[in-house]
Amino acid sequence: MNRKKHQILKILLLCLISSKSSASEKELNLQFIRHKFGQNTEDIELFFNSSTVLPGNYTVDVKLNDEVIGRAKLEVSQDDKESYCLKDEWLSDLGIIINRDFYNKYFNIKRECYEIGKEKNSITTFDNNSQIFSLYMPQAAYIKKGNTEHKWSYGDPGFNLNYDAYLSKNDEDSSIYGNLEGNVNIDKWVLYGRGYKYEHDKFTTDDVTLSRAIKSLEGDLIIGDTYTNTSLMDNISFYGVQLRSNNAMTPERRGDYSPIISGIAKSNARVTVKQNGVVLHSELVSPGPFHINNVRGIRSGELVMTVTEEDGSEQQTRIPVTFIANLLSPGNYNYDFGIGNKEATWEPDNIFAYGSFDYGLNLLTLNASLLFEQHYSNAGIGAVGSIGSLGAVSVSGNISRAKNQLETDQGYSTSANYSKNVGANGNLQIIGYKFSSEGYTQYANFDYRAPRKDKKEKERYEVTLTQQFPASNVFLSVTGWKKFYWNDNSVTGANVSYTQNFGTVNASVNGSYSRGDGAKSDYMLGFNINIPFRHNDRQFYSNSGVTYNRNSGIGFNAGFSEDVTKNFNYNVNAAASKDNESVSLSTNYTSSMFRTSASVSKNRNSTNASAQIGGAIIGVKDGGVMLTSMSSNSVAIVQMEGLAGYAFTNGVESDWRGRIAYPMTTYMDNDIQISTDKLPSNIELTDNVETIVPTNRAIKLQKIKYKNMSRHVLKVYDKNGFVIPMGTAVKNSNGEIISFVNNNGISLLNIDKNDERVFFGSCTISTSGLKDNLSEIQEVNCE
């Protein structure tokens, strides 16, 4: 329909609607509208959309702030003309826990439900043609369910194998390197391992473990190559059996430090938080500012937050993190028990056993540990206490007895740490001191066959300060330490980092200093600046810097990069120092099945080239084997069988079997949500949102049920040749209301292709002869 005709029809309709005769007195005559509307389906919906909602039971898709969250039965009564009244249980079943104080004045005592739409910032609407019920609620009005509401998912039997292969070549030789890491899941058990191979070496494996999460103990049973996790002794890796608590398993015991991560989303976006390449958290946020304060599993280091918008564009923010003292809430505890050997043998003389337990009291956390073997023993006690606004203090003491082939050493070690959160911006100060007597021996350094005297630590001082200035977009971090050894040697080190953003420009200064064992001091100072810019409607990023090192002198580097597409980018870089000059080009490409990169560089002495390919191979029972470029600790295979090439979730197109790999955060709610706007118009979801709480390294096959629909615009006549009256309910073969008759017998229908008949009141029509067409009104007779 062209614009001129469209405007004329709108004017005619306005004239008819504004007449004094109401719809009940005189039915609107639409005979002047031609039966053929061209190809614009919006014209049909514009003319025939009706806001009339009759009392009854409806099966509806429910949207919360424009995101489909599920499908539910909606009961509409005569009292719902002004505002829909929603029961607490109905909302809870959809994963919404409303703030009762927020909606307290809108609670209908007689009907025992909330008239949410009467609150000025909330809206409830029901489109009876599309069968969509929409809720618009501010963030302060509701919360999402915690993972205690959902059962753990150990996943399905399957495997997840991550691989990387690397080839490099220069003027003289070439080398090949391969790396594998993965797990095989059977029932509730996970067999995990990783291995690598250099060109001429044998394939080497390490970190091979068999583990199981035990919910009743809120911990993990681990068999194989693992590591101790105690608060009073230096942690060591060992081969054996271990049972240890896992704070990630229950919200009330998650004592890990979690910074507040803030940002602004331009659209409905996915926020992903990673550390060291591992996905710690991923969730969808609405447009506007967001705050995330429940990221778990963080360690000291740097977080990378990526905001992926609906159009596929991304923005990254790097967030430095340092731990504060570990205080447990009253009644909470951590434990770690194990038996094994520091080497991959089970010789009785070398087997050790250990235990560690932390327990939270009011304002105090107590720590205790014990380790013993035939030639070594260690015991420790400690406490972490809050001193209110002044911060937190921890003190501990250990004693050891170490017997080697020559003599027996006995000694003690004491430590004290102070930490304080300064201000509301996550600023942190940590001061630490540790003293060890000459006879004290850490088990990590103990060897019965080869006693060591030269590197026994005597004293250690540490200080860390991190400071944020949000108004100036400044982050400052200073760390310093000094160690003294009993052989009169010492080691000193310090790091300084200063970062500031000037709009989209990022500048940083980094410095380090070290000196130890009589060697000359070494220091480094560097300055780096990143500037994004546009040229010919293309987005580029420049990066340049200068460094000074005592040994190598001054060095310069400059480069730029471009994201040509969301899957492909390249980087050009040049560098110069007193000993060398070089230039390099690198490219990166990521598909739904793999990721690959290639680079070439040239310096004074040689030319180098390299290539890399990586990804994951995932197999799951009843879901087959698939290739993906995504790497994740826990993963869901989301499948809409028969729908290949559609990016219905995670922004990645489905493979030939309609599958997409979806990263999940361990022991947290993961809402597997389908983007219906990415699907063909004839697809209607039976279930949209599935919440999964995966265990560590779980592989879950999630099949999404859907109906293949046909869409029609019908003008229906009864047995006597009259059009079906306006307001007549249209039902499918299951008796569910799917639409209503509009003016002049016109109905807009979405019909399951498996439905053979549709009912208009007391008469019925066969669907076999209907055309799947929204651009033409079909006239049919009702039987």
Curated annotation (Swiss-Prot):
The Gene Ontology CC terms held by the record are: cell outer membrane
The protein's matches in PANTHER family, at most eight in alphabetical order, are given as: FIMBRIAL USHER DOMAIN-CONTAINING PROTEIN YDET-RELATED (PTHR30451:SF21), OUTER MEMBRANE USHER PROTEIN (PTHR30451)
Compartment list:
Cell outer membrane
**What GO molecular functions are on record for this protein?**
fimbrial usher porin activity
Which InterPro entries does UniProt cross-reference here?
A: Fimb_usher (IPR000015), Fimbrial_membr_usher_CS (IPR018030), FimD_plug_dom (IPR042186), PapC_N (IPR025885), PapC_N_sf (IPR037224)
Q: What does this protein do?
A: Involved in the export and assembly of K99 fimbrial subunits across the outer membrane.
Q: Which PROSITE patterns match?
A: FIMBRIAL_USHER
Q: Write out the entry's keywords from A to Z.
A: Cell outer membrane, Disulfide bond, Fimbrium biogenesis, Membrane, Plasmid, Signal, Transmembrane, Transmembrane beta strand, Transport
Recall the taxonomic lineage recorded for the source organism: Bacteria, Pseudomonadati, Pseudomonadota, Gammaproteobacteria, Enterobacterales
**Cross-referenced Gene3D superfamilies:** 2.60.40.3110, 3.10.20.410, Outer membrane usher protein FimD, plug domain (2.60.40.2610)
A Gene Ontology biological process annotation? pilus assembly
Lipid bilayer topology = Multi-pass membrane protein
Record protein name field: Outer membrane usher protein FanD
Signal peptide: which range, if any?
1-23
> Which Pfam families does the annotation name?
PapC_N (PF13954), Usher (PF00577)
Q: Which organism is it from?
A: Escherichia coli
The disulfides recorded in the entry are C763-C782
Q: Which family does it belong to?
A: Belongs to the fimbrial export usher family.
